Amino acid sequence: MKKKLTQLTIALALALPLPAMALTVTTTTDATSLANTLVGSGVTITSATLTGAANQQGTFSGAAGAIGIDSGVILTSGDARLAPGPNGSDGDGASLGTAGDADLNALIPGFTTFDANVLSITFTTNTGNLFFSYVFASEEYNEFVNSSFNDVFGFFIDGVNIALIPGTNTPVSINNVNCGNPYNPAGGTNCALFNNNDLQDGGPFFDIAYDGFTNVFTASITGLTIGASHTIKLAIADAGDTVLDSAVFLKAGSFSSVDPNPVPEPATLALLGLGLAGLGLSRRRKAA
């Protein structure tokens, strides 16, 4: 009898849904620790430096259900501790009174950046390639879409920005990835790549504080010199004002020399086709 009760208890426990993980953030100013959180296969980190206030950056976990990345490093233009959801305000942010960044200024001619958060990593790669996964999120969605109040970020490898919309040369930004704003909801750009979490639109829909965020993107560069030192500068800042926060979530272990989304070789596709054809023939024979 006792054995049956134990088996029933185990069965019920397995049948119950697991509690959803919630996004948590642990702030740090240790650049090496942040860099080591990101490093993956085929990449060796030799040094790292950080520009940022005490609570501006850190590590995160439990975010898979919210943004599609479970854990990694968060860089913000304000306070990383404001990132966990649910979204309770359209105006979360921290004004730090710190300087902007010249490389980010160059991405938005005519505007000035503030409160820059910069993680610079010197590394080598054993293939000449680098890939990593990330999500960009902001409190400036959706009210400031198509305005000049757009926080800015960039991933500069040896000075070249690779924070681009997949398959294009267009930088990822609030104005380039959105579903419009409350005053012009039909005026979206790359809406399929955007996730709306705005209270004005009936949110929150995701367990994160930001009003909107992109899909998981993969940044990449090929043709680097194998074994040579290269530097990547991961930077984000307020632009136009210092009021609302934005963030970049970088996936743990995704700084890799191996493409996480490889395109199958033609021979592999041919073998897959033959396998499916054989499966279909086998099923027809059984039916006969």
Language-model regions: role of each:
Residues M1-T9:
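Bacterial N-terminal signal peptides that target proteins for export
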Residues T9-P17:
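Bacterial N-terminal signal peptides
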Residues A15, P262-P264:
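Generic structural signal for beta-strand residues in well-ordered domains
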Residues P17, N87, F144, D245-S246, ...:
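Short linear functional motifs in flexible/disordered or boundary regions
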Residues L18-A22:
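Sec/Tat signal peptide C-region and signal peptidase I cleavage site
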Residues L23-N261:
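Aromatic (Trp/Tyr/Phe) and Gly/Pro-enriched flexible surface segments
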Residues P264-S282:
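A short, hydrophobic C-terminal helix/tail in secreted or cell-surface proteins
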Residues R285-A288:
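Short, charged juxtamembrane terminal tails flanking transmembrane helices
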